[in-house]
Regions:
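Short, hydrophobic/aliphatic alpha-helical segments
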Residues: 8-12, 69-74, 199-201, 205
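N-terminal "arm"/small-domain region of PLP-dependent enzymes with the aminotransferase-like
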Residues: 2-62, 70
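A broad "ordered helical/assembly scaffold" signature
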Residues: 27-30, 39-40, 54, 65, ...
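Short, mixed-charge, low-aromatic patches
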Residues: 22-30, 46-50, 75-78, 96-99, ...
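Conserved PLP-enzyme active-site core in the AAT-like
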Residues: 2, 15, 19, 80-211
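Conserved N-terminal alpha-helix of the aminotransferase class I/II PLP-enzyme fold
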Residues: 40-89, 114-121
Length: 211
């Protein structure tokens, strides 16, 4: 969980989330284990009963990943961060965590082709409806909200067109209707934009770009 801090982005990037290393190494070690050892079977049972907060299995938690996640959470002014194997895994994971059969979502028209493929190819299989809107014509957004709209998804600046969306205005509209907002912040990076400060619920990055 990210802590409140007055540190700058450079300090956060270098030091956030790094525990006191027993041998004094200045670079966090890379833990390559798949599982972890426990003193007793009771401790192991307790760890596997709370997989969201303990190092029980590397696919879920790993000390190396935790260091990175803490840095990302602090850079984005968020509480938590979760790392995935790819940017599209993060996008898909966020979408499927927030949307279910019968739900409706609204996406910016200009977005990454991989995200476009998720909506056009896979949403119909999951029974999820969606519409696109042009962020340069904000009046389109409210007209496309339905009773079952659960998410508004932005990508700003868009990849690769650099079309911008007014994050703050979108959040105001979304909050009036009780809708969550997710932003792909890849092209801006947390150095230039912190969407959470405007009311966004989830921020997504592909870390092969600017982070």
């Amino acid at each position: 969980m990210s802590e409140n801090t007055l540190q700058g982005n450079a300090t956060i990037s270098i030091h956030a989330g790094e525990p006191k290393e027993q041998f004094g190494a200045v670079v966090p070690p890379i833990y390559q284990t798949s599982t972890f050892e426990y003193e007793t079977t009771f401790a192991a049972a307790e760890a596997f009963g709370d997989l969201h907060t303990t190092n029980a299995y590397t696919r879920l938690h790993n000390p190396t990943n935790t260091v990175l996640e803490e840095k990302l959470a602090q850079l984005e002014h968020g509480k938590y961060a979760v790392t995935f194997a790819s940017g599209m895994a993060a996008v898909t994971g966020a979408l499927l965590a927030l949307l279910s059969n019968g739900d409706h979502a609204i996406f910016v028209k200009a977005k990454y082709s991989g995200t476009e493929e998720v909506t056009t190819k896979y949403f119909p299989k999951f029974g999820i409806e969606y519409d696109d809107f042009d962020p340069l014509h904000m009046e389109e957004l409210e007209s496309k909200i339905k009773p079952n709209t659960k998410l508004i998804y932005l990508e700003t600046p868009a990849n690769p067109t650099l079309v911008m969306a007014d994050i703050e205005e979108v959040c105001k509209i979304a909050k009036r209707h009780g809708i969550k907002v997710a932003v792909d912040n890849t092209f801006a990076s947390p150095i230039n934009t912190n969407p959470i400060d405007f009311g966004v619920d989830i921020v997504i990055h592909s870390m092969t770009k600017y982070i």
